[in-house]
Amino acid sequence: MSEYIEVKSPSNLKVIGKVKRMSKDEVRGEIEEAYKGFELISKLPLYKRTKILRKVSEILEREQERLARLLAIEAGKPIRDARVEVLRASRVFRQSAEEAAIVLEGKNYRVDAYEYPMNNENRIVISSREPIGVVTSILPFNFPINSFAHKVAPAIAVGNSVVVKPSISTPLSSIEMKKILVEAGLPDSAVRVVTGYSNEIGDEVITHPLVGLITFTGSTQTGLSIASKAVSLGKRIIMELGGSDPIIVLEDSNIDRAASIAVKARYEYAGQNCNAGKRIIVREEIADKFINAFREKAKMLKVGDPLDETTDVGPVINNESAKKLNDVIEDAKAKGGDIEVLSKGPETGYFFPLTLINNANLDMLALKTEVFGPIAPIVRVKSDEEAISVANSTEYGLQSAIFTNDLNRALKISRELKFGAVIINDSTRLRWDSLPFGGFKKSGIGREGVRDTMLEMTENKLIAITLV
């Protein structure tokens, strides 16, 4: 199959490149090549692997502007945000180099503390962490560079090779990242990038016998399907799945600050972040005041060309996404929601207006599903208990936020929230690249974060020595 797939910019629909539409046979060949890469990279001394990762970090800093412009054009991410993503990716490669020795150092166990088996006083037991082999990394469209870093850098650090399958919407960034790794000294076979449609090659990167672990970031439905196939074959998995993160605003909070943070948490990158503040839950006593502040701040956001330095919000990724968002709006209208358009973008491109749903309720798609776009449903509640109930009402549990000046109250509520993180007086968008990141319920399986990813990507082997 020698066809190619055109890559179009979501901001103007122009063709910006093309990638190979790989066949299953071609993907099998790439996986086999990656296994050869594993045999090379796993035998490299750790200092050589970390030297490569540090070099990648340096190149990313040097190439920040070029990569940021590619990211803005390909993913529709505003250029200022794109620069931050490239810089974060650089830091992830550096942190992976720094953390690797700590993760891989193993342990010495005092087995003489146990009566059974007999004669433990004559034994030494140690453990080592060993690479799994070939890791399949399936990337989302929304963070093609930083997600590449989070999945590839820890894998290489601990001695795995990687097959990267980028989103078909944003494959060019992965191809550039692969080039940078090779420039930094990584064997070409240690990272392979496969491109094509998921319904044609997706099963191959999951079920191939040489693949030992699949790490996926994307929708819950797709992720659970992948997990089911992988686990049935005895493969390891890391799943970073959907989210419908609530922002709870209590009556004693700083309303203006809460509104500013909520606007950015919901509308940044056109609402296409897994940990965007997708549901806003406000105490009835302050709802009108909060909504007025939210409305005015959202109206100040500029929706437009991602390459424009003054742009705050770009387009959604494709027409399918825009259609789904329209369905959410129509559903909200039919179920009693008051719809307000707060800011619009250009006519050309996949620009979706920044939208507010006032008087939202739990029957709406906007509250029941993960809405990947700039739609902000606001729910009024009369008590903290009701706020907790609304927050926990979905199948998702990625991150959450509480705004209040009462720390004791915030901590009590945080105990009841079923989420991987509870952020007090700040955005659901907060993420520390070295700390555990993942969710409860259907928001994920396992955790990302440099050290946690390394642990997930290695096997723990015990070695017992009996002294004779």
Each predicted region: which residue ranges?
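N-terminal Rossmann NAD(P)-binding subdomain characteristic of aldehyde/semialdehyde dehydrogenases
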Residues: L53-F148, L186, V191
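ALDH superfamily catalytic-core signature
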Residues: L213, Q221-N361, I424
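N-terminal alpha-helical segment of soluble enzymes
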Residues: S11-I79, V86, A100, E285, ...
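Residue-level signal for inorganic ion chemistry
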Residues: L13, R49, L71, G159, ...
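Rossmann-like NAD(P) dinucleotide-binding subdomain of oxidoreductase/dehydrogenase enzymes
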Residues: Y109-R257, V381
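Short, small/polar residue-rich loop motifs at catalytic or cofactor-binding pockets
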Residues: M1-E3
